[in-house]
């Protein structure tokens, strides 16, 4: 997860209560895919293809229980609160290296902002039938491979897991135990998630992955089908042949609240990065880009301001007005302003935040 994406939005919070671990819904067949999602102004609080928002929030409670609910300490004066304030100060000063230079700060950021992001991202992913099929491992009888660039803080990871979990048929493990030989008992396909980030989020990723596997997937074969790998690298510097291999064989790439920062810091390198996607991604790979809606997501070229989505479209798709040409990618869906609003009844000890953004979903030609 690259670094300027860390700014916040706003909603409400409540105190810690009972932690429900699991949803009553567990099969994707209960929730048929809408193959023609409409352009909407606001995403639903809970898409039935994901675990409920409270269960997503609860995963962070369980993972970081000691940090969020310290014994014999006032939450307002806890070490976590102090670290959150330090991260806020570093972000305000645009000192992104300092904001994420140790595990304490990275965990503080994850506790403060990732629950809102994970809940929002889950609704975003579930909005697209193409992405649901990938995350549920329902494409071409093969494993699904997902790359989350700038995904170290866990929002994408937990959102993907909230959909993957509901797609698992947990009756298969009982069939195996009873030696039942039927169609239900065949080997499940794997969801392979690669997270790449310029900061070292390995501790956060390991903690969240362990909780996902123990509390949502219950270990055994279902947990073995959910594979997570973290790479500590700057995506703009991944130019060597061994680095470029990461783009081959992918079904989905996500760039969530990352592109604006890339272009703000290094325009030329960012253009080359997107061009590497043009050259190395296989046909059929999907690319999802989310970014803040409004003037924040503008870049300046030759003293002129352009919406960042205009530049991205041009690099990936080409001149959209020229119907006679085909670019490296085709635009599947777009929206220049859409909201995800948190349910104010959600139980979390830190304020949760709404999200207004634009999105682009592309597919590789």
Swiss-Prot record:
EC top class named in words: transferase
Catalysed reactions listed for this entry: uridine(2843) in 25S rRNA + S-adenosyl-L-methionine = N(3)-methyluridine(2843) in 25S rRNA + S-adenosyl-L-homocysteine + H(+)
Subcellular location: Cytoplasm; Nucleus
Pfam families given in the database record: Methyltransf_34
Disulfide-bonded cysteines: none
Keyword rRNA processing attributed: yes
Keywords: Cytoplasm, Methyltransferase, Nucleus, rRNA processing, S-adenosyl-L-methionine, Transferase
KW ATP-binding (keyword) present: no
Example GO BP: rRNA base methylation
MF GO annotations: rRNA (uridine-N3-)-methyltransferase activity; S-adenosylmethionine-dependent methyltransferase activity
Main location: cytoplasm
Lineage top rank: taxon: Eukaryota
Example of a GO cellular component annotation carried by this entry: cytoplasm
Enzyme Commission no: 2.1.1.312
Function: S-adenosyl-L-methionine-dependent methyltransferase that specifically methylates the N(3) position of uridine 2843 (m3U2843) in 25S rRNA.
Family: Belongs to the class I-like SAM-binding methyltransferase superfamily.
Name of the molecule in the record: 25S rRNA (uridine(2843)-N(3))-methyltransferase
